[in-house]
Design a protein with these regions (language model features):
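His/acidic metal-ligating clusters that form di-metal
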Residues: 110-137, 142, 147-217
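Divalent metal-coordination and catalytic microenvironments
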Residues: 8, 36, 51, 63-64, ...
Length: 279
């Protein structure tokens, strides 16, 4: 069994399907999708319909685009027709996503499945691969609030994170009322943070895999100079900085030459790519 992480598909369902074929994803495997499956690309409706009907071995986290969509959808329970999108989501692809959904058969019927699905999403999870805990999050955590010491008391910290978090079996909602890696972070931080996480020279208290921020060549040069001289990655590539692994490879900007969908096999950290231009 292999466990994979992918993020920021942004409505490129055909590319997503090609990735599933490339990794030979099967019923014994696990897939974690770290948010932002919608907006920007031409196939948001197909991606959302697939997401609301997948088997239990596929798990979704809430990204900032799901956050924007839920902010609108949760206030308009009657259906998609005539929905007021709002400026923020409209500026980030929401209008096109709603139009795409409306163009599909039974769109308003599927809307209620979509509401149920979106209401269940949380922005992070902690899983275990070979007895190693790994934090999965859409955007990142605020380094200012790191206060775990996994070297002195690893069992306590790992148990704390499990209590705070969410698992596929329990679907426990996140709470943020105690200290620790995740406990003091609000959901907005975990879905929207960028530079203060990406450019922090503080290692995360445990291995972390995140999306949201594709790393450009210029940003990687800054990381190599200021953060981690052993970092790797760059435009269109999965980044490895300290113990933080960024898997957004730029599908929000599909016309860039380097844009790709990246996927990371967490068992051995093997990388897989599908170019935005791959047909």
């Amino acid at each position: 069994m292999s466990t994979y992480a992918i993020s920021d598909v942004h409505g490129h369902f055909s590319s997503f399907e090609r990735m599933l074929d490339k990794i030979s994803f099967g019923t014994e495997d696990e897939l974690w999708v770290l948010g932002d499956i919608l907006d920007k690309g031409p196939e948001s409706a197909e991606m959302l319909v697939w997401a609301t009907s997948v088997p239990e071995n596929v798990h979704f986290l809430r990204g900032n685009h799901e956050d924007m969509a839920w902010d609108v959808i949760s206030r308009d329970p009657e259906g998609l027709s005539g929905m007021r999108i709002g400026d923020r989501w409209a500026a980030n692809g929401g209008t096109e996503t709603i139009e795409d959904l409306l163009s599909k058969t039974d769109a308003d019927w599927r809307y209620f499945d979509l509401m149920d699905w979106m209401s269940s999403l949380v922005p992070y999870a902690v899983i275990e691969i070979g007895h190693e805990p790994i934090a999965l999050v859409h955007a990142g955590f605020d380094p200012y609030y790191y206060d775990l010491n996994t070297e002195e008391d690893p069992e306590h910290d790992i148990n704390l994170l499990r209590e705070l978090g969410w698992t596929p079996s329990s679907r426990k909602r996140i709470t943020h009322d105690v200290g620790g890696l995740v406990g003091v972070h609000d959901e907005t931080t975990m879905m929207w943070i960028r530079d203060s996480w990406v450019f922090s020279n503080e290692p995360c208290p445990m291995k972390a895999v995140f999306g949201h921020t594709p790393i450009t060549e210029t940003e990687m040069r800054r990381i190599l100079s200021e953060v981690d001289p052993n970092a790797s990655g760059g435009a269109g590539k999965i980044s490895h900085v300290l113990n933080k692994h960024g898997i957004d490879c730029g599908m929000a900007e599909p016309f860039e030459a380097t844009s790709a969908l990246g996927c990371l096999r967490l068992n051995d950290m093997k990388e897989f790519y599908v170019s935005a231009f791959e047909k």
